[in-house]
Structure formats: structure tokens, C-alpha cells
Amino acid sequence: MATAKVVYASMTGNNEEIAEIVEEALESLNVGVETTEISQADPADFEDSDICIVCSYTYGDDGDLPDEAVDFYEDLKDIDLTGKVYGVCGSGDTFYDDFCKVVDDFAAVFEQTGATKGSDVVKVDLSAEAEDIEHLEKFVSEIVAKQSAL
């Protein structure tokens, strides 16, 4: 059975909800899942999983990493995830110019780790609506299919 590690950062609860949607979608595809809040996670935990997923929000007017995600983000740069499949999703507010910038930032760091991109990023405006849930389920299906093909 394939395994997945889902790490999330959530201030308002929106990304925790997104992580739960992702977790349920993975479980429905018979993937073993462990979900952890980012301040309690270590990027090295990804080395023990087939699938690596980050769900994060973007903080402030300048598209900053959440404070609780900075160490995880920096440490992720030093991990070799060759042979793993990754995905990044998260919520933000389209009011800001840097809507979901951190989602793109995490995707760029995953590229540096040698991991294989499983799906395009998913960006959710505020909280997940029905259409967003469909996008997240497709995101998970694509990641699992990519992992199965390795």
C-alpha cells in the first residue's frame, strides 16, 4: 500500500479543512495517510512516505510564509526526495496581489528536492466550496496515479 504524509499550516482552519479533504481522498484510494500540523512536522518525515503533500496559507500583504512554516520550508530545501511524488495546495484570499504565493513557493522547493510533481497546484479562495473539493479530489487522483506509475 502506498503511503502519504500531509503537512498543513492553518490560521483560520481553512487549510486544516483542505488537509482533511486531501486525507479523505487519499484514503478512498487506499493510500495510508498521516496528517500533521506544520509546526509539529519535520521534512525528513517525507522520506518515509511515497507521497508528500503540503497545504499552506500565505500570510500578509507581501505573500509571506506563515511564521510556523519557515523552519519546515528552509529544512525542506536540504532533503532528497528522489523517487517521491509531491503535491501542494492551499487557501488564500484573492483580495491580495500575492494570492496563494506560498503554494507556488513550496512547489518550487519540492522541485529542488528531486521529487516528482504529481499534479498542478490547487489554490482555494478562502474556504473550500464544492468546486474546490472536486479540484482537490482530482489533484489527489493525479498524484496517486503518478506515484503508481513510478
Could you tell me what each predicted segment is?
Residues 40-45:
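Short acidic active-site motifs
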Residues 2-3, 14-17, 25-29, 34, ...:
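FMN-binding flavodoxin-like domain, especially the glycine-rich phosphate-binding loop
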Residues 9-13:
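Short polar catalytic/cofactor-binding loops
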Residues 7, 36:
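The conserved SAM/SAH-binding core of class I Rossmann-like methyltransferase domains
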